[in-house]
Amino acid sequence: MSVISMKQLLEAGVHFGHQTRRWNPKMKKYIFTERNGIYIIDLQKTVKKVEEAYNFVKELAADGGKILFVGTKKQAQDSVKEEAERSGMFYVNQRWLGGTLTNFATIQKRIKRLKEIERMAEDGTFDVLPKKEVVKLKKELERLEKFLGGIKEMKELPDALFVIDPRKERIAVAEARKLNIPIIGIVDTNCDPDEIDYVIPANDDAIRAVKLLTSKIADAILEAKQGEEAVVTAE
C-alpha cells in the first residue's frame, strides 16, 4: 500500500503548480499538463516521490537521526511547528537566521542566552530585578523564543533538512548543501529541483497541501520510533 493516495493529494490541491510564466524548466519532468495558465503537477510522480522521501526519513529516524523542519512562509508556519513537535523534531518557522547551520556555535550562544533568561523567569530572579530591567529581559526572551524556540534543544547539526519551498528557504538550502546535509523538499513548479536530494513535486502555496505532506514526513519519523519501541518491548 502506498504511503499517500492520489485521492488525498487531489483533495488537498497538491497538483496545482504556479502560473506558466513563473516556472523553472528543470521541473518539466514533474509537470503533467497546463490548464488555464497554471501548471498541473503529475501526481503519479508525487506519490512515488513521497514514498522515497518517507522511506529515507524512516530509515534516518530509526538510526536516531534528527530532522530539522524549515518553513517560514505563512502557509507553512503552523504545519511546520505542529508536525515537528508531534514527531519530536526541530523546526524553524519564522525567519531563517543566516548561519543557523554554518555558524552553529554562534547560534548555540544565542540559545544559551535564551535558556538563561528562561531560568531567571522561573527561579524568581525577575521578582527582585527593577521593573525596567524585567521588561527588557521579557522582550529579549520573546524575540529569542520566536526565532530559536524550535531549535533550542538541538545540540548538534541535524542529519537532514525538510524544507517547504526551497526557493524561499534558499539560505537554509545553501547552508545544508555546504555541509553535505541531505535535503527533502516540497518543490513547486517555480523551484530548482537540482538542489534537493529528495524532491516532492507539489503545490507549496496551499495550506492543506503543505499540511498533508508535512504530516507524512512526521508519520515516517513516528513509525520509525514506534518500531524502536516494539523492538525494545520484544527484548
From Swiss-Prot:
<dbReference type="InterPro" id="IPR005706">
    <property type="entry name" value="Ribosomal_uS2_bac/mit/plastid"/>
</dbReference>
<dbReference type="GO" id="GO:0003735">
    <property type="term" value="F:structural constituent of ribosome"/>
</dbReference>
<keyword id="KW-0689">Ribosomal protein</keyword>
<dbReference type="InterPro" id="IPR023591">
    <property type="entry name" value="Ribosomal_uS2_flav_dom_sf"/>
</dbReference>
<dbReference type="Pfam" id="PF00318">
    <property type="entry name" value="Ribosomal_S2"/>
</dbReference>
<keyword id="KW-0687">Ribonucleoprotein</keyword>
<dbReference type="GO" id="GO:0006412">
    <property type="term" value="P:translation"/>
</dbReference>
<comment type="similarity">
    <text>Belongs to the universal ribosomal protein uS2 family.</text>
</comment>
<dbReference type="InterPro" id="IPR018130">
    <property type="entry name" value="Ribosomal_uS2_CS"/>
</dbReference>
<dbReference type="GO" id="GO:0022627">
    <property type="term" value="C:cytosolic small ribosomal subunit"/>
</dbReference>
<protein>
    <recommendedName>
        <fullName>Small ribosomal subunit protein uS2</fullName>
    </recommendedName>
</protein>
<dbReference type="InterPro" id="IPR001865">
    <property type="entry name" value="Ribosomal_uS2"/>
</dbReference>
